[in-house]
């Protein structure tokens, strides 16, 4: 699934929404664990990479690196 390519600062949608009602998350840290921040209430959650890949629904916005 090429749709599930994700990177730092991408906005992603998870299978289940956050309790605040928002379902868009920003990836703020990548490694063995992924830290994502809710776009609705700014709460951050750290999830193991394997669990994140399983719960990821789709990438909403890809972060573009500025070209100089």
From Swiss-Prot:
Pfam families: DUF951 (PF06107). It comes from the Bacteria. InterPro entries: DUF951. This is Uncharacterized protein YyzM. It comes from Bacillus subtilis (strain 168).
């Amino acid at each position: 699934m090429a749709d599930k390519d994700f990177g730092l600062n991408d906005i992603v949608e998870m299978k289940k929404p956050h309790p605040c009602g928002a379902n868009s998350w920003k990836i703020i840290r990548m490694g063995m664990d992924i830290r994502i921040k809710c776009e609705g209430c700014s709460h951050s959650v750290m999830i193991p990479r394997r669990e994140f890949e399983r719960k990821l629904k789709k990438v909403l916005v890809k972060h573009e690196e500025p070209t100089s």
